[in-house]
């Protein structure tokens, strides 16, 4: 175990605890930048999904891990971002303005959900957000004139300033850039008075209120920021899949997102990335591992779901 002694406030709020962190983060970034030349196309696609889910995980970690508000309908924000991006793209907007619209609308919906949720806590908040998830899924399925209903919407490759990002490598770097930007934003937020207020609310609402922290304001702000990051992830998810439909943003997706941050480690920015890595790669390794099992076991229906659930 390494002990780090801090002698001034600037060391306490630094992004890196010591020089070793700078080295390892730099090495990780180097590997991520070189990944398109090191990985096959299939695994590069999986890594792209890890980056996309990491952005969503950062938002949910901000809400659940740092503010203590659990959402069981978070896939709804993902869906709002994805469908907004799809509709704006079909209307002729380029990637950046469409992304701004997707992020903004998701954030606005987060505020709408956050305000009623101020009156409930714990399992009741979970039920409220779960109900919201069902409502959004139903709206996406019924509003056929805009969302295409159950037939879904097809998307094309993102258009950046007149240039189509159609290659897997180009889209990967776009996701990597937005992931780094989101991570730095969350890290700096957590070092600010706002981030400290989130943590204070998570630890004790009574103590936080006694220190002058406005619970309603900061809870709503946490919902808004979490939903905004989910909107960014949803926009990227829509372009990566190139087809979206309401069932992609149902209760199972919400449970996966919540498990992602719980398994990764609540209250840790790293946990969002570890959880996303687990969520994306575990089913792939289960599928690959079936080849080494006896035929009777390997071809048994539901094996993947069973192992995934047990883990």
Question: Model features per residue range: what roles?
Answer:
Residues 1-311:
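Transmembrane alpha-helices and adjacent helix-loop boundaries
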């Amino acid at each position: 175990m390494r002990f780090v002694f801090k002698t001034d406030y600037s060391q306490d709020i630094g992004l890196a605890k010591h020089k070793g962190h700078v080295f390892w983060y730099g090495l990780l970034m180097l590997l991520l930048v070189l990944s398109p030349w090191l990985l096959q196309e299939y695994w590069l696609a999986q890594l792209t999904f890890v980056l996309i889910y990491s952005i969503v995980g950062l938002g949910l970690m901000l809400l659940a891990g740092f503010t203590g508000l659990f959402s069981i309908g978070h896939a709804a924000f993902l869906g709002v971002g994805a469908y907004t991006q799809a509709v704006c793209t079909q209307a002729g907007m380029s990637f950046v303005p469409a992304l701004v619209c997707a992020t903004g609308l998701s954030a606005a919906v987060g505020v709408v959900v956050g305000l009623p949720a101020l009156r409930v806590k714990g399992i009741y908040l979970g039920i409220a957000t779960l109900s919201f998830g069902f409502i959004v899924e139903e709206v996406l399925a019924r509003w056929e004139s805009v969302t295409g209903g159950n037939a879904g919407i097809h998307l094309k490759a993102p258009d950046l300033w007149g240039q189509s990002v159609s290659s897997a490598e180009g889209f990967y770097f776009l996701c990597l850039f937005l992931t780094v930007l989101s991570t730095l934003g969350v890290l700096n937020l957590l070092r600010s008075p706002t981030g400290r207020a989130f943590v204070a609310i998570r630890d004790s609402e009574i103590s936080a209120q006694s220190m002058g922290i406005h619970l309603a304001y900061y809870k709503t702000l946490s919902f808004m920021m979490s939903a905004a990051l989910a909107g960014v992830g949803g926009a990227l998810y829509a372009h990566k899949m190139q087809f979206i439909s309401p069932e992609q943003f149902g209760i199972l997706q919400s449970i996966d997102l919540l498990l992602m941050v719980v398994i990764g480690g609540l209250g840790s920015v790293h946990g969002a990335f570890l959880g996303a890595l687990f969520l994306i790669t575990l089913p792939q390794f289960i599928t690959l591992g079936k080849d080494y099992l006896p035929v009777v076991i390997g071809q048994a229906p539901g094996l993947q779901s069973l192992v995934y659930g047990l883990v």
